[in-house]
């Protein structure tokens, strides 16, 4: 019984560095209706880079 229009869906954040590294988190659709962009640590290249929401 998956909730298709859940208020807090699970999303994947994918590294923009092209390493393929991902973070999995939840977001609130009411507060952040646009795609999420966060600066997080990518251990494959040992740097902080932007991670973008992947749908």
Curated annotation (Swiss-Prot):
GO terms for molecular function: structural constituent of ribosome. Keywords: Ribonucleoprotein, Ribosomal protein. One of its GO terms (biological process) is translation. One of its GO terms (cellular component) is cytosolic large ribosomal subunit. Belongs to the bacterial ribosomal protein bL33 family. This is Large ribosomal subunit protein bL33. It comes from Paenarthrobacter aurescens (strain TC1). The gene is rpmG.
